[in-house]
Amino acid sequence: MAVPKRRMSRANTRSRRAQWKATATNLVGVTVAGQQRKVPRRLLKAARLGLIDLDRR
C-alpha cells in the first residue's frame, strides 16, 4: 500500500477531494407496455423483460 512521504496540507487535500464528483446516470428511453419510460442503460434489458417495476417512482 502506498504511504505518503510528507503530510499534505488541508487546502491541497480539500482541493484534491473537490475533484471527486459523482456523475449523473445517463437515461435511455424505453417503451414498456405502450408507455415511454427513461431508465439507466444498465437496467434497459431488465425493464424490457419486465423484471423491474417501473411504476414505483
UniProtKB/Swiss-Prot annotation:
GO cellular component: large ribosomal subunit
One of the Pfam families matching this protein, by short name: Ribosomal_L32p
Molecular functions per Gene Ontology: structural constituent of ribosome
Coiled coil start-end: none
Domain of life: Bacteria
Keywords: Ribonucleoprotein, Ribosomal protein
Gene Ontology biological-process annotations: translation
Keyword Ribonucleoprotein: yes
Keyword flag Ribosomal protein: yes
Entry-linked SUPFAM superfamilies: Zn-binding ribosomal proteins (SSF57829)
Family: Belongs to the bacterial ribosomal protein bL32 family.
HAMAP family linked to this entry: Ribosomal_bL32
Name by which UniProt lists this protein: Large ribosomal subunit protein bL32
